Design a protein with these regions (language model features):
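Ankyrin repeat domain, specifically the short helix-to-loop turn at the C-terminus of the second helix
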Residues: 18-24, 42-50, 75-83, 114-124, ...
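Leucine-rich solenoid repeat scaffolds
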Residues: 2-14, 20, 128-158
Length: 158
């Protein structure tokens, strides 16, 4: 995993800013996680299969874009063939894009839009992540009744 993603995962904003100030050439995972759509588009133009790659830590670009709240990056990945129901390959977490969207940090409106986008692209509202945790469980854990209602309307089991 890159230093940049490690800093992002750790919430170390100063380190993230320091690393980004050096204007690094972002890989597909970093571009997705930071919502750098121009770089993401460039990487996908070079090799469309990157939309479905997995990072060393097991996450995929779509899950990163969703978790970190980048709707345009998520839409770009979906439009370029990212598998909306692909589970990350980490041993314990195994999340899909819909799980990441429903659990995303940030405001409810952003989570709602990301969940809606994933569902519009065929996300399974009942797909369990590792341990059986479902997207609706994430919405309930966040107290996000709007996302919970959307999931129920799209077939999530209560």
């Amino acid at each position: 995993m890159s230093d940049l993603l490690q800093a992002l995962y750790a919430g170390d904003r100063d380190r993230v800013d320091e690393l980004l100030a050096a204007d690094p050439e972002l890989d597909v995972f970093e571009a997705a996680a930071f919502g750098r759509d121009d770089r993401l588009r460039e990487l996908l133009d070079e090799d469309p299969s990157r939309a479905n790659e997995f990072a060393d830590d097991g996450f995929h670009p779509l899950g990163l874009a969703c978790f970190f709240g980048h709707r345009d990056a998520a839409r770009l990945l979906l439009d370029r063939g990212a598998d909306v129901n692909a589970l990350s390959t980490n041993e314990h977490v195994q999340t899909a894009a819909l799980h990441a969207a429903a659990a995303a940090a940030g405001d409810e409106a952003m989570r709602y839009e990301l969940v809606k986008l994933a569902l519009e692209h065929g996300a399974d509202p009942n797909l369990p992540q590792g341990g059986g945790f479902r997207p609706i469980d994430a919405a309930r854990q966040n107290g996000d009744s709007r996302v919970e209602q959307l999931l129920l309307e799209r077939g999530a089991e209560g």
